[in-house]
């Protein structure tokens, strides 16, 4: 377990603790429990707070359970997609929920596991958070029609040469299907001379988002989160697509006027804000944190306070 403690560093940990400083009692929902780093720190500081932890990855959840064993009786762990499980928890617990945390990153344990397919040297082409899910990266890369590959590379990877890459992948797989992440990574490297970013980075991002329906799940969650009352919502994102969804949702939550934009005059009483944005700009890791944990460098945290 000490090895896990050393391997896994929770991103923006002190900033998360600061965001939840007002919480004393009630329930905190950690929508992306992972290895339980954030939850463990919060429970340590908040003796009267209870936790609901959610994660798709049952292996990670077992590790989190072991790390949280000193808080036995104060937490309940749920398996599955966080949008669905959060909605269920909100229906059951309602206003007892005082804090919600969503960390959209992939854990170091998942990234470094060569059997999971998240890194460029993996012996698998998988990328599933939920190992019971039918869709994996191999099916996407070796089976998706070219037009479908173009779409996910464009929409989820924001890749400029999305058509070229999709067609090159299709040409190669027709001769020899891709067998693992290392095979795909090396092939993508042969197509690009980009020195600033590994040629496979954005393709891997796009495929991972597709395999795990990441953006759709985030959209569903943000819509459901509108029903929170007197709760603090903290979301950590790791790329521009996620951050844009969170930023726009928070702006929407904070709108007083809900009239049609084309209206000449407000007719809605102009008092419909669900609360206030607590972060005018996203909170990012300090230079020291980035030095100690390079994978934190793209993290952005936004916080919203819902009113009663």
Curated annotation (Swiss-Prot):
Provenance organism: Helicobacter pylori (strain J99 / ATCC 700824)
Protein name: Ribosomal RNA small subunit methyltransferase H
Entry annotated with the keyword Methyltransferase: yes
Chain's role: Specifically methylates the N4 position of cytidine in position 1402 (C1402) of 16S rRNA.
Pfam families: Methyltransf_5 (PF01795)
Claim: Cytoplasm is one of the keywords in the record: yes
NCBIfam families reported in the protein's UniProt record: 16S rRNA (cytosine(1402)-N(4))-methyltransferase RsmH
Assigned keywords, A-Z: Cytoplasm, Methyltransferase, rRNA processing, S-adenosyl-L-methionine, Transferase
Homology family: Belongs to the methyltransferase superfamily. RsmH family.
Record gene name: rsmH
